[in-house]
C-alpha cells in the first residue's frame, strides 16, 4: 500500500500545514510520496528532513522582517517576497535556520514540488533530483506569487506558484501509485474559493505571461473541483482531508502573530484525525494480508 500526503500551502496560512506535519513527526507517521504546493513544499522539505518545528519561525517570526516581505523589497528588488532570503540566506548551510539537506536526501520517501511554468502555464513536478545542497530554487519557484514577485528562473524557464497550474494535485498522486492520500488544506472544506481577485491579478499579468494569467483565471475552479473530488474519495476511505474550521481571518499574507499561533495549534490538534486514519488504514492492510 502506497501512502501519499499533499500540503497545498496558502501563504502564511501554511503554518497550519506546518503544525499538521510536526504532529506527524511526533507520531512517527511516514508517507511514501510527499507533495507540496507553494508554502506546502517548504513544509514538506522540513518534514522529510525530520526537522520538527523548523518551519514555524518562517511564518511567525521571519515573515515580520523587512528582508522577508515588504514594500521596500518591492521597490528595491521588484519582488514583495524576497524568496532568495527565505530559501537562501535563512535556509542554506550556515544560515539562521538551515534545511538538513543530507537528511532530506536520505529519506526513502519521494518528494514532489509543484510549480507553474510561466511561459506555457503547465504544471512542473520537481523531485529530489532537482534539489542540490544550498540550491533550493524549486521551493522558490513553487512559492513565487505572480504580479507581486518576479518569476523564479530555473534553467532558463520562469516559474510561478504551483497553485496556478495544479493547486490540489490529488489526481497526480493517484496517477503516481498512491492507494491512500492525506490532503492538508489551509481553508475550511466548505469555503468555496472565489475567482474575483485572481481575475484582477490575471489582467495585470496578461501582457507578459498570458498562459500564466489563464492559469490564474482557472485556479479557483481547479481548486474547488479538486476539493469536491477529494470529498468524494474521502467517503470511499481513500482520502483523509485535514482542514481548519476557520482561517482566523487570515488571507495569504496576513501577518498577525496571534492568528498564526492559533493556526499552528489547530494544525497540530486537527492532525489527530490523520493519526487515527493512518492507524486504521494500516490495521486494515495487515488484516487484508
Where are these regions (language model features)?
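Patatin-like phospholipase
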Residues: 1-37, 45-289
Amino acid at each position: 500500500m502506497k501512502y501519499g500526503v499533499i500540503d497545498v500551502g496558502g501563504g502564511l496560512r501554511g503554518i497550519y500545514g506546518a503544525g499538521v506535519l510536526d504532529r506527524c513527526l511526533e507520531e512517527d507517521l511516514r508517507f511514501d510520496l510527499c507533495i507540496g504546493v507553494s508554502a506546502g513544499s517548504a513544509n514538506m522539505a522540513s518534514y522529510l528532513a525530520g526537522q520538527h518545528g523548523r518551519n514555524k519561525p518562517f511564518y511567525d517570526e521571519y515573515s515580520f522582517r523587512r528582508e522577508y516581505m515588504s514594500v521596500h523589497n518591492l521597490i528595491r528588488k521588484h519582488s514583495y517576497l524576497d524568496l532568495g532570503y527565505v530559501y537562501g540566506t535563512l535556509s542554506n548551510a550556515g544560515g539562521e535556520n538551515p534545511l538538513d539537506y543530507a537528511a532530506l536526501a536520505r529519506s526513502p520517501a519521494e518528494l514532489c514540488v509543484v510549480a507553474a511554468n510561466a511561459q506555457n502555464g503547465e504544471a512542473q513536478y520537481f523531485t529530489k533530483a532537482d534539489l542540490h545542497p544550498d540550491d533550493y530554487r524549486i521551493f522558490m519557484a513553487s512559492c513565487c506569487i505572480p504580479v507581486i514577485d518576479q518569476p523564479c528562473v530555473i534553467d532558463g524557464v520562469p516559474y510561478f506558484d504551483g497553485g496556478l497550474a495544479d493547486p490540489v494535485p490529488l489526481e497526480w498522486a493517484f496517477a503516481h501509485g498512491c492507494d491512500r492520500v492525506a490532503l492538508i488544506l489551509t481553508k475550511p472544506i466548505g469555503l468555496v474559493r472565489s475567482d474575483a481577485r485572481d481575475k484582477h491579478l490575471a489582467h495585470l499579468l496578461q501582457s507578459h505571461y498570458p498562459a500564466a494569467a489563464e492559469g490564474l483565471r482557472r485556479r479557483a475552479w481547479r481548486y474547488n473541483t479538486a476539493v469536491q473530488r477529494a470529498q468524494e474519495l474521502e467517503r470511499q476511505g481513500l482520502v483523509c482531508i485535514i482542514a481548519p474550521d476557520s482561517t482566523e481571518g487570515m488571507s495569504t499574507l496576513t501577518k498577525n502573530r496571534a492568528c498564526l499561533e492559533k493556526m499552528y495549534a489547530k494544525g497540530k490538534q486537527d492532525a489527530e484525525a490523520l493519526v487515527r486514519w493512518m492507524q486504521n488504514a494500516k490495521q486494515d492492510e495487515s488484516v487484508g494480508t
